[in-house]
Amino acid sequence: CGSDMHAYHGKDERRVPPLILGHEVSGTIQNGKFKGKVVVLNPLISCRKCHYCKNQREHLCPERSMIGMSKPLKREGGLAEFVSIPNTNIYEIPSSLDVKEAALAEPVAVSLHAVLLGEQTLKQPIKDCRILIQGAGAIGLICGLILSKEKKCKKIVMSDPNKLRLKECSKYLDAKFVEPKNQEIDENGFDMVIDSVGLEVSRQQAIHVVAPGGSIIHIGLTEPSGNFNFRKLTIQEITLIGTYCYTNKDFKETMNILTNKKLGSLKWIEYRDLKKGPEAFKEIHNGKCVAPKIILIP
């Protein structure tokens, strides 16, 4: 996950070493209520008692924690042979779903939540919108696949400075693929912008290219602050909405999406041995990784 890379770079205050990273996890339960079951884990743990939890907004629980994080509560993550998690966060996998593909449930839930939240802000049917997706990583690609295959959107542009990633995504997503400075990314040219990057420069581009009355859906967490054109946001009635994680309902829906192959081919996932994890981090850091998602197998 991109957030694991933030930790790798020492830029995530919620992930402080020593810590086992990893929150996109599937496998076989070794003990307890679900012993022997093949499952996927919802890594987001909430109190289940507060106002937010009782109103199906568990991702906003003030006591939430996540495996693979050290704050607010240290919970070791899934980049290991074993991981511990409450029974309430365990979902059995249908026999028709490959256990390795099931590990994609968490980023699919993140992407689904972002698309649904963004759709609520629009003033026209989402299928008719001009949409820019910033970032050709897993979240950007999955958002694009949901928009294209589930929401029937036809006017999608994906931007990323990594040409290798763009080329790989072009094999699976029906969209235009451009670098961020491409002329096709026009001022006021998009009804919705999905920022899966979260840099100051991506936010500046998002507000520049979003059309009057349009929406910016902010997912990325790379840089927490920076300059932003709030004047345009105000006088052009732009909706800027942050989106974090997903609800339990979103997570359950991802099981339906994955089981029924609604994202199409998942050959863009690369599988590697867990022992080769350090090499994967280095490749991503150096911009040499083609795959939008690498899954490590213990």
Specify the residue positions occupied by each region the protein language model found:
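Glycine-rich phosphate-binding loop and adjacent beta-alpha segment
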Residues: 200-260, 297-298
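Glycine-rich beta-strand-centered segment in the early N-terminal region that forms part
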Residues: 11-54, 94-96
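C-terminal hydrophobic helical "lid"/dimerization subdomain
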Residues: 204, 248, 252-298
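A short acidic, Gly/Pro-enriched loop at the edge of an enzyme's catalytic core
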Residues: 184-193
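Mid-domain Rossmann-like dinucleotide-binding core that forms the NAD(H)/NADP(H) cofactor-binding site
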Residues: 97-180
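Short acidic-hydrophobic, aromatic-tinged amphipathic segments that line or gate anion-handling sites
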Residues: 176-182, 271-276
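N-terminal Rossmann-like NAD(P) cofactor-binding module of classical short-chain dehydrogenase/reductase
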Residues: 40, 194, 217
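NAD(P)H dinucleotide-binding glycine-rich loop of Rossmann-like/cofactor-binding domains
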Residues: 49-134
